Amino acid sequence: KWFIDQVRARFNEKRYQYVDLAGFYWIAEDASHTGNIITPIANYLNELKYSFNWIPFFNSDGHESWKELGFHYAYYQPNYYFDDKIPLTRLDEACKEALRCNMQMEMEFEDDVLAAHGKAYRLENYMAKFKEYGVWEKCRLAYYQSNNALLTLKYSSEPADVALYHKFCKFVIERPIRDSH
């Protein structure tokens, strides 16, 4: 409670004109060691009318019981992008599991998304699979893009990178479901 109260107080002191404190994010990516404190925190945030969000990793402990733990939204991490040895079927499995558990999804990519690094196809695969399974049109999406991946794509001198940047932006802005929280 102390931490939440401190964040709220410091945020309110700033009197931001165009930014709202809409909710809180639980940083632990599984529920193995924190499960007993999540629900009381969720209850407190509910009293304060804040959203409580979680992004568990693929097949993590507790991902199926995210609602029972008290989260408003859980965004399932496919963890597909990072390791080239992980097959495309991981995205199929992740999409099916997220839909089965009524979860949202996370799209992941990093600064090595540039064509020169040979990983652009993995971001392309996320976009294709999210559309194939209806995630793009039915689910909220969280985006993990490392440090500067979008800027790196946008300002690349390689036309394929800039094209991927525009394709990704179009993917985001044309989604049927878009709201702030």
Predicted regions and their residues:
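Substrate-binding cleft of secreted/luminal carbohydrate-active enzymes
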Residues: 59, 71-181
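Aromatic-lined carbohydrate-recognition surfaces of secreted/lumenal glycan-active proteins
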Residues: 1-4, 20-30, 42-63, 107-108
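Beta-propeller domains
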Residues: 31-32, 36-38
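Alpha-helical scaffolding within the catalytic cores
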Residues: 4-12, 57-66, 86-94
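An active-site-proximal structural segment forming one wall of the substrate-binding cleft
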Residues: 1-20, 129-130
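Aromatic- and acid-rich polysaccharide-binding/catalytic face
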Residues: 17-29, 63, 67-85
